[in-house]
UniProtKB/Swiss-Prot annotation:
One of its GO terms (molecular function) is all-trans retinoic acid 18-hydroxylase activity. This is Cytochrome P450 26B1. Its EC number is 1.14.13.-. It catalyses: all-trans-retinoate + reduced [NADPH--hemoprotein reductase] + O2 = all-trans-4-hydroxyretinoate + oxidized [NADPH--hemoprotein reductase] + H2O + H(+); all-trans-retinoate + reduced [NADPH--hemoprotein reductase] + O2 = all-trans-18-hydroxyretinoate + oxidized [NADPH--hemoprotein reductase] + H2O + H(+). It comes from Mus musculus (Mouse). The gene is Cyp26b1. Keywords: Endoplasmic reticulum, Heme, Iron, Lipid metabolism, Membrane, Metal-binding, Microsome, Monooxygenase, Oxidoreductase.
């Protein structure tokens, strides 16, 4: 017994020594990691590097960021201020909040900073995209892509978008059980991007498979760039390869069949616009371009659509006021009239309260956290040096949350954007859901168009209620969305705003 007791004590002592050694090793390595990045400061500049933590060697604070969500940024902003350093997704990063700070970054494109997304996003989106291009190449690509989102192009997309949304809402209302709004909004925006924006005639079964693959792709766009089996980065690369094959097949089939079209879709415009600028696009450029267009129309719009539905659920008075505006304009048509072409761009533009609702959703629930830049030359920001070679992320969501121009910043209040109040009129960099400067989101008008049509159709054709006891928590990666997807039961409404019986709803859905 004595020897057994001594052996146990010896084992515990060995374990304790190992734990102490590991703890000391972690502490020393973490300290060396902090010093390694502190040494990169520009010694010709007397200003200090921003305060903050670089986390653990190699992984930095990526784990904290993924687990804490919005709390990561807010806790560090409270501790270190509006400009702080961290290490995310395999690289050192300075995060920036506040209108004046963001203004300097956005207006400093090509002089102080240049765009550079995290490595995972650069690889997965591809080298031929607008997002990954810089300088003259970026300017030329924007000219080519801008025609896709012109007023004329949006007017041609509108009837098709309205029909896709009407079709989807009837399908939601015909379901006997609640639906997962975020997941179904992803299906809706993916269908809109593929069918309407790109004009692909992909069979329904193949479209469903592509959607599943695309979800895997989007979920890993922002991942630790470590190419190992079963890593998120590897899954993203595999998804990209499958998507590229599917897109090439769809593009080739589309180029061979130009008969029977009643409008020019984005791919038609993209090919024609590139020819006008003296360049014939290669197949790889077309594949990267279509992948980027789907990405732009899919993830962020699905996020905003889900946020819109959640806020209309939380604020029935807002929904009723929206219905009153539609009723006054003769647009409260009900689900019994699946008519194409009842909306026009000028009609949507005249709906002032609708515009306020969409703006407020985008203020409080901006789908993306911000934008990434690489520092071209050391400059000063908020009393700190931003060293050449470092990465900077300007924070859209936190700039909205801390903007002094907005009263009761955490309250959902569409009237803050009314003509009487116009809280966003003082300083354009307090409100920037679509970024700013030379890299303002090209598809912002399409996104707003989609959200407005969705709001009109929701108010006109649907009653909806939360299927859970409480509203879900929100997570931010890869874009803002409810952790459970938001479970909601939908019911169809007729032209008199009376609920449509399930049998009638099923008949309407079957005719689409």
């Amino acid at each position: 017994m004595l020897f057994e007791g001594l052996e146990l004590v010896s084992a515990l002592a060995t374990l304790a020594a190992c734990l102490v050694s590991v703890t000391l090793l972690l502490a020393v390595s973490q300290q060396l990691w902090q010093l390694r990045w502190a040494a990169t400061r520009d010694k010709s500049c007397k200003l200090p590097i921003p305060k903050g933590s670089m986390g653990f060697p190699l992984i930095g604070e990526t784990g904290h960021w993924l687990l804490q969500g919005s709390g990561f940024q807010s806790s560090r902003r409270e501790k270190y201020g509006n400009v702080f350093k961290t290490h995310l997704l395999g690289r050192p990063l300075i995060r920036v909040t506040g209108a004046e700070n963001v203004r300097k970054i956005l207006l400093g494109e090509h002089q102080l900073v240049s765009t550079e997304w995290p490595r995972s996003a650069r690889v997965l989106l591809g080298p031929n995209t607008v997002a990954n291009s810089i300088g003259d190449i970026h300017r030329n690509k924007r000219k080519v892509f801008s025609k896709i989102f012109s007023h004329e192009a949006l007017e041609s997309y509108l009837p098709k978008i309205q029909l896709v949304i009407q079709d989807t809402l009837r399908a939601w209302s015909s379901q006997p059980e609640a639906i997962n709004v975020y997941q179904e909004a992803q299906r809706l925006t993916f269908r809109m991007a593929v069918r309407v924006l790109l004009g692909f005639s992909i069979p329904e079964e193949d479209l469903g498979h592509l959607f599943e693959v695309y979800q895997q792709f989007v979920e890993n766009v922002f991942s630790l760039p470590v190419d190992l089996p079963f890593s998120g980065y590897r899954r993203g690369i595999q998804a990209r390869q499958i998507l590229q094959k599917g897109l090439e097949k769809a593009i080739r089939e589309k180029l061979q069949c130009t008969q029977g079209k009643d409008y020019s879709d984005a791919l038609d415009i993209l090919i024609e616009s590139s020819k006008e600028h003296g360049k014939e696009m290669t197949m790889q450029e077309l594949k990267d371009g279509t992948l980027e267009l789907i990405f732009a129309a899919y993830a962020t719009t699905a996020s905003a659509s889900t946020s819109l539905i959640m806020q209309l659920l939380k604020h029935p008075a807002v929904l009723e006021k929206l219905r009153e505006e539609l009723r006054a304009q003769g647009l409260l048509h009900g689900g019994g009239c699946p008519c194409e072409g009842t909306l026009r761009l000028d009609t949507l533009s005249s709906l002032r309260y609708l515009d306020c609702v969409i703006k407020e959703v985008m203020r409080l629930f901006t789908p993306v956290s911000g934008g990434y830049r690489t520092v071209l030359q050391t400059f000063e920001l908020d009393g700190f040096q931003i060293p050449k070679g470092w990465s900077v992320m300007y924070s859209i969501r936190d700039t909205h949350d801390t903007a002094p121009v907005f009263k009761d910043v955490n309250v959902f209040d569409p009237d803050r954007f009314s003509q009487a109040r116009s809280e966003d009129k003082d300083g354009r960099f307090h409100y920037l859901p679509f970024g700013g400067g030379v890299r303002t989101c090209l598809g912002k008008h399409l996104a707003k168009l989609f959200l407005k049509v969705l709001a009109v159709e929701l108010a006109s054709t649907s009653r909806f209620e939360l299927a859970t006891r409480t509203f879900p928590r929100i997570t931010l990666v890869p874009v803002l969305h409810p952790v459970d997807g938001l479970s909601v039961k939908f019911f169809g409404l007729d032209s008199n705003q009376n609920e449509i019986l399930p049998e009638t709803e099923a008949m309407l859905s079957a005719t689409v």
